Amino acid sequence: MEEKMNIAVFAGSFDPLTIGHYDIVTRATSFFDEVIVLVNSNVSKHSLFSVDARVRMAQAAFSSMDCIRVESFDGLTVSFLDRVGARFLIRGI
């Protein structure tokens, strides 16, 4: 029987990605098999950087860590969790 991966999602606008975001994600890697940094698109919110630019910044920040991937999504976070089979949502303070 195949063991399920523990996948966690850390969702946010990351406009821009901060050292605090980076710290939360890297700490989460010790608890989960995979951490997905989910860059949300909110058209009603004015962004400093485009979604593509924010994704590229996050990909560059986490490029040396194989257990972290970066994606963008413009729907509900819970829909993304279902789509990727994630059971955990990481929250910062």
Predicted regions and their residues:
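Nucleotidyltransferase catalytic core that binds NTPs
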Residues: M1-I93
